[in-house]
UniProtKB/Swiss-Prot annotation:
Family the UniProt entry places it in: Belongs to the RNase HII family.
Major site of localization recorded for this protein: cytoplasm
Reported cofactor(s): Mn(2+); Mg(2+)
Class of this enzyme: hydrolase
SUPFAM superfamilies in UniProt: Ribonuclease H-like
Its EC number(s): 3.1.26.4
GO biological process, alphabetically ordered: DNA replication, removal of RNA primer; mismatch repair
Name by which UniProt lists this protein: Ribonuclease HII
Cofactor note: Manganese or magnesium. Binds 1 divalent metal ion per monomer in the absence of substrate. May bind a second metal ion after substrate binding.
PANTHER family with a match to the protein in the record: RIBONUCLEASE H2 SUBUNIT A, RIBONUCLEASE HII
HAMAP family associated with the record: RNase_HII_B
Disulphide bridges, residue numbers: none
Chain residues that bind a divalent metal cation: 76-77, 168
């Protein structure tokens, strides 16, 4: 009779819920064996569910594949809302039918998984471009226009150049066919890939700024208006990376000028 350890090793090789190996092992009354069977079945079901989720997130890409297009770039940005730091956009071209386990809208990915999935995108992408527009430009042109500039910069770095753009809720004035998708980072794998690249890139930048400008908790809040950030603003004033067109930074800077 096989040991439970041997059965566990055998079950790792089973990839289908209908496998005859399960039927055979289910005759074994040992509780340890039944426990391993249940565990393996749950793992297989989780893999099937994940594959279905990823498949559903390729629906926009698959429509474009039917038209003979394969160089499809997903575009997304991070950092529209913060009081400090740049807006960062990423453009990512994934290989045809590429599925990266765990890839999703970056807001839905556990923080501890960010770097792992970012690395998987880096490893598998055909091309990646990153656009970074700083707070000074944001203050000059407004955040919406700055976001478009960041996206255009990211796209310009792609090689090969894309045949079609899938963009998260935005239209760009570029001579490339494009589709604007509401909640694109949750509905397109290409956009989700851009989302995690932009997110990790910006988070790392804000960690560096935290070293330069201590007291605002940038490493944790990424420039968003948390209690610690606002406390730092009140005590220390605005830094060179703060967006002076955003409240409450604007009022704080104006108040200091008037006094």
């Amino acid at each position: 009779m096989a040991t439970i350890k041997e059965i566990k090793e055998l079950l790792v090789t089973v990839k289908e819920l209908e496998s005859p190996i399960f039927l055979e092992l289910e005759k074994d009354n040992r509780s340890g064996v039944q426990k391993e069977i249940s565990k393996r079945k749950r793992a297989i079901q989780a893999e099937l569910d994940e594959n279905l989720r990823l498949e559903s997130m390729l629906s926009y890409e698959k429509e474009l594949y039917k038209q003979g297009l394969t160089l499809i770039a997903g575009i997304d940005e991070v950092g529209r809302g913060p009081l400090a730091g740049p807006v960062v956009a990423a453009a990512v071209i994934l290989p045809k039918n590429c599925k990266i386990k765990g890839l999703n809208d970056s807001k839905k990915i556990p923080k501890k998984k960010h770097l792992e999935i970012f690395q998987a995108v880096q490893d598998q992408a055909l091309s990646i471009g990153i656009g970074i527009i700083d707070n000074q430009v944001i203050d000059q042109v407004n955040i919406y226009e700055a976001t478009k500039l960041a996206m255009q910069e990211a796209i310009s770095q792609l090689s090969p150049q894309p045949e079609h753009l899938l963009i998260d809720a935005m239209k760009l004035d570029l001579p490339i066919s494009q589709t604007s998708i509401i909640k694109g980072d949750a509905n397109s794998l290409s956009i989700a890939a851009a989302s995690i690249v932009a997110k990790v890139t910006r988070d790392e930048l804000m960690k560096e700024y935290d070293q330069q400008f201590p007291g605002y908790d940038f490493a944790t809040n990424a420039g968003y208006g948390t209690a610690k950030h606002l406390e730092g603003l009140t005590k220390l004033g605005a830094t060179p990376i703060h967006r002076t067109s955003f409240e409450p930074v604007k009022s704080l800077v104006l108040g200091k000028k008037e006094s």
